[in-house]
A protein has these predicted regions:
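N-terminal signal-anchor transmembrane segment
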Residues: 1-49, 72-81, 134-137, 344-349
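A juxtamembrane structural motif centered on a specific transmembrane helix
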Residues: 1-5, 166-179, 330-331, 352, ...
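Hydrophobic, aromatic-rich transmembrane alpha-helices
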Residues: 37-53, 155-168, 309-328, 367
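Transmembrane alpha-helices of multi-pass inner-membrane enzymes
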Residues: 38-44, 337-347, 353-381
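Hydrophobic transmembrane alpha-helices and their immediate junctions
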Residues: 64, 106, 173, 306-345, ...
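Alpha-helical transmembrane segments of multi-pass inner-membrane proteins
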Residues: 71, 75, 97-103, 107-137, ...
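A membrane-periplasm/extracellular boundary helix in multi-pass inner-membrane enzymes
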Residues: 186, 208-247, 264-269
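Long extracytoplasmic/lumenal interhelical loops at the membrane interface
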Residues: 245-306
């Protein structure tokens, strides 16, 4: 990476630190950091590529375009939002992050260079979160932090899919894929996030299915299905890592089931337009008198915040990403993308990373969307 770009990535590092480890409660400093870093990122991206907005919408594929349209709708929702400024900023944030990723991945002209940049970027994200969470929040070996586990899960699914697909597998690429796979596995192994782990299993199942190992896929799907159907098995493992707590208790502690019920009730009041991007969980927080910073579900969150229109836009984005990865699965990189996208979509059932505040999961899923475009344009070498 050329040194002239260092400030852009310094700003991004500060932004992700703010998102992960600086609570917005109790003052405006954290919010100011987020605003300054985000608009600093946009200013520098615009400086390096003046046509970035037009390029991102007019010259990319339907996946990137649908991402931008979804969050433009989120910006528009500030006109009727419960918290107008809040909705406007959060939606605009996801547009700026997409522009940043379109610019970043667009710098690479070869597939191997592009893939390496993506993998190192994702690994840096989840290692940063896994290490700093232990240093700043909870100094234990086993942690419960969904963003790091989820990003690691998507990375692991991608690497596993590409290892099985065995396209362009020179020794350097094999070592990179295997190294990133085992780092991802280590982070997942030391995480008690049920959503992240089950999503990773689902992504790996998809990798087996389309990477030439359908028998393994059936076995993996059976494991995932068994864990969903037989909750006592899940509770058994929960008690190993989180003594005295089962899945129901954990969900009740975070308020998920209570918040979901309230969001569904609120969705019925504004079915078409919703309460404004990222706002429905805030309305639920006021009504229930609890802290609910996240809807913990993309589908419920999008329906509550952006109504049926926003939900259909979100489904369209995920569907087109899956479709393009599936139809191009015979090309290098796309089996990995298909597995990682499946993992990310499954993750949306436990964390609303597309329906509210952005986090590392949002960054990685948006990266997958952008790569569905760039993987088809770069050279093999």
């Amino acid at each position: 990476m050329k040194s002239k770009y260092k400030w852009l990535f310094i700003l991004f590092a500060i932004w992700i630190y703010r998102i992960d480890f600086m609570p917005a409660d109790g003052g405006g400093f954290a919010k100011a950091v987020q605003v300054v870093t985000l608009f600093g990122i946009y200013f520098l991206v615009y400086k390096y590529q003046r046509n970035i907005l037009g390029y991102s919408y007019n010259r990319t594929n339907v996946v990137v375009k649908s991402w931008i349209v979804l969050y433009v709708w989120g910006v528009i929702s500030s006109l009727w939002a419960f918290l107008p400024t809040f909705a406007f900023f959060l939606a605009l944030q996801n547009i700026i992050l997409c522009l940043f990723l379109v610019w970043f991945y667009g710098m690479f002209r070869t597939f191997k260079g592009l893939e390496k940049a993506f993998l190192l970027f994702v690994v840096s994200l989840f290692l940063f979160e896994a290490v700093f969470y232990r240093l700043l929040v909870r100094p234990t070996f086993i942690i419960h932090y969904l963003p790091s586990g989820s990003t690691a899960g998507m990375c692991m699914a991608y690497c596993f899919g590409e290892i099985l697909a065995a396209k362009l597998n020179d020794n350097k690429r094999k070592k990179l894929l295997k190294g990133c796979f085992w780092l991802s596995f280590l982070v997942l192994l030391t995480s008690t996030s049920t959503g992240a782990n089950l999503s990773a299993l689902f992504g790996i199942s998809m990798a087996c299915m389309f990477g030439g190992k359908p028998v393994y896929a059936v076995l993996m799907f059976s494991v995932v299905g068994a864990l969903y159907l037989f909750k006592d098995i899940l509770d058994y493992f929960m008690n190993i890592f989180m003594p005295g707590k089962d899945e129901t208790t954990i969900q009740a502690v975070t308020g998920r089931t209570i918040v979901w019920d309230e969001i569904k009730r609120l969705s019925e009041q504004r079915p078409l337009l919703g309460w404004g991007y990222g706002c429905v969980e805030r309305v639920a927080s006021v009504n229930l008198n609890i802290q609910a910073p996240d809807a913990h579900n993309n589908w419920i969150g999008l329906k509550g915040s952006l109504g049926w229109i926003g939900l259909l836009m979100g489904v369209y984005n995920m569907a087109t990403a899956t479709y393009i990865a599936f139809t191009k699965r015979m090309k290098r990189g796309y089996v990995g993308l298909l597995a990682a996208i499946a993992c990310g979509i499954m993750n949306g059932y436990s964390f609303g990373y597309l329906a509210g505040k952005a986090c590392s999961i949002t960054i990685v899923f948006c990266s997958l969307c952008v790569l569905t475009f760039y993987y088809n344009r770069v050279k093999d070498a």
